UniProtKB/Swiss-Prot annotation:
Region described as Disordered: spans on this chain: 97-154
HAMAP family named among the record's database cross-references: Ribosomal_bS6 (MF_00360)
Annotated InterPro entries: Ribosomal_bS6, Ribosomal_bS6_sf, Ribosomal_S6_plastid/chlpt, Transl_elong_EF1B/ribsomal_bS6
Annotated disulfide bonds: none
Gene: rpsF
Protein name: Small ribosomal subunit protein bS6
GO BP term, pick one: translation
Length: 154
């Protein structure tokens, strides 16, 4: 049977549990039509490059599928009907990767770096340096700056 990689984007206002339930539904569709899901990766909520159906973020999931084309067509038909699915893309591949995808490897690498530094991801704040400042540093006392005009008058 042909092998496919399928990426699914679900609305951000559905819970992770609801996304898993949706994937279980699509897994059932694949299995009813003679296929099987080899691997499921939940990439979590990520920002989108641009708004899709008024959403700035979405739940991302990767499905590795071994199924006949009719099963993929039925799954995609049901995804088009669902209001919770923003986008999806199915690509036929020669072989499925058994190792974690690049997104999962990146997440593991980032988590490992943060643990080595002794902080978590969400502690960073603006600028990524742990505070509000960027790369400018303190400019010190700038002294008396005198009167400034703001245009319009005189």
């Amino acid at each position: 049977m042909p092998l496919y990689e399928h990426v699914l984007l679900a609305r951000q206002d559905v819970t992770s549990q609801q996304v898993e339930t949706m994937i279980d539904t699509y897994k059932g569709v694949i299995e009813q039509n003679g296929g099987r899901l080899e691997k499921i990766e939940m990439w979590g909520v990520k920002s989108l490059a641009y708004r899709i159906k008024k959403n700035r973020k979405a739940h991302f999931a990767l499905l590795n599928i071994d199924a006949p084309p009719a099963a993929i067509a039925e799954m995609e038909r049901q995804m088009q009907i669902s209001e919770d699915v923003l986008r999806f893309m199915t690509i036929r591949v020669e072989e499925l990767d058994s190792e974690p995808s690049a997104m999962m490897q990146k997440r593991d690498r980032d988590d490992r770096k943060d643990r080595e530094r002794g902080r978590r991801r969400d502690d960073e704040g603006f600028g990524g340096g742990g505070g509000f400042g960027g790369d400018r540093g303190d400019r010190g006392d700038r002294g008396d700056r005198g009167e400034r005009s703001f245009g319009g008058e005189g």
